Amino acid sequence: MTTLMVQGTTSDAGKSTLVTALCRWLARQGVAVVPFKPQNMALNSAVTADGGEIGRAQAVQAQAANLAPHTDMNPVLLKPNSDIGAQVIVHGRAVTSMDAAAYHDYKRVALQAVLDSHRRLSAAYRVVMVEGAGSPAEINLRAGDIANMGFAEAVDCPVILIADIDKGGVFAHLVGTLALLSESEQARVQGFVINRFRGDIALLQPGLDWLEQRTGKPVLGVLPYLMDLHLEAEDAIDVRQAGKSAEVLKVVVPVLPRISNHTDFDPLRLHPQVDLQFVGPGQPVPSADLIILPGSKSVRADLAWLRANGWEAAIQKHLRYGGKLLGICGGLQMLGTRIADPLGLEGPAGESAGLGLLDFATVLEADKQLRNVQGRLLPEAVPVTGYEIHAGVSTGSALARPAVQLDDGRSDGAISADGQILGTYLHGLFESPDACAALLRWAGLEAVQQVDYHALRERDIERLADLVETHLDTAKLRRFCGLGG
């Protein structure tokens, strides 16, 4: 069994994308490959088949490997809930919240969890394809590292280093990163991949020749810039949109300081009839057909931010003029009358008044709800699939008019008596074509085109595997994977 690791010179260098591409490239050949990320820091997460929580990038990589997501694919997930702290999730379950200093001391425990997961995957699959985090050359983070070279040294695996040429300085990034590694770590780097190149490759060739001569390591290939690649972002909100038709529905989403699972909105970005706008701090709230309150890792703090930025008055005005309002997970909790956090799970213990638009209250509890679900989205009763990731338990009379009837017999969320407001705990509901179309009709779009988001994602994964075939040295890659030339 072989482990191969992809590390990057910076965040957003293309690590997730390359691991996704390599997983599908190997799966096409019938190789049993599994994705793995030792430690991930992200607020976008997915629910696994075994009832845990991992980064969404690893869920996409699992799809590329033709596997169901599993907690061993991302044994340590850090979900920031303040500027200096994060909720620590190990093997899919929340352990506690820690500040950076406390987590540094906890890393020995985290490393053991990482190695346990890697050992299980190595026993079950031919190739473990590993994604690093950020950069391996962050001097202040190297002590006790479990995400990059610390992991590679622990399991004795080779490394590919990827860099993004589109941002400039690619040769400085690669040479500088290599120079900051120890001799044993430098020896692990088997070669380089340059990502997001546009232009004439012949003009780049002298630089590639210099890089190989300077470092003694091969350039494994140059991946082109793909203008319309729309895989789910791991951290930053992707604001690119597909081309729009003449008739569009205007949808507005506030960029909360602790917004979570903003990948919920990717299907809307790609929908030809939706004009999606993310609104940040200090920006005026534009007129819209639909306002969506997204998920949040710190609901009470983000609700205070909404009020401070004028959103409460803007929402009231929006509703007075007939606009629709949707709350998802933390956004649902904000719609109620009260949010209580007696245990201090998301910040200082206490409670906050909600927006008071639906008659229910929420109490945050230590036992987080994690499940994949399916059911019927009301009032049209169209099929919907999604997933729940929340610590809140909501109760109140508004829940007697649910938004979703789940197949397991439970009901979820609420719809206001006048039909203007809908709230649900379900993430991912826009990925269901029928549910997405029903929500767009509810928001005022008459003739809705159905878009199969899963088919679009599968198409992009296939395109990435094609790039491996045409632009990378596949003979060397096969050798790194222990498969021969």
UniProtKB/Swiss-Prot annotation:
Keywords: Cobalamin biosynthesis, Glutamine amidotransferase. One of its GO terms (molecular function) is ABC-type vitamin B12 transporter activity. The keyword Plastid does not apply. InterPro entries: Class_I_gatase-like, CobQ/CobB/MinD/ParA_Nub-bd_dom, CobQ_GATase1, CobQ_N, CobQ_synth, GATase_3, P-loop_NTPase. Residues 248-435 form the GATase cobBQ-type domain. The active site is at C329, H427. It comes from the Bacteria. Catalyzes amidations at positions B, D, E, and G on adenosylcobyrinic A,C-diamide. NH(2) groups are provided by glutamine, and one molecule of ATP is hydrogenolyzed for each amidation. This is Cobyric acid synthase. It comes from Stutzerimonas stutzeri (strain A1501). The lineage of its organism: Bacteria, Pseudomonadati, Pseudomonadota, Gammaproteobacteria, Pseudomonadales. The gene is cobQ.
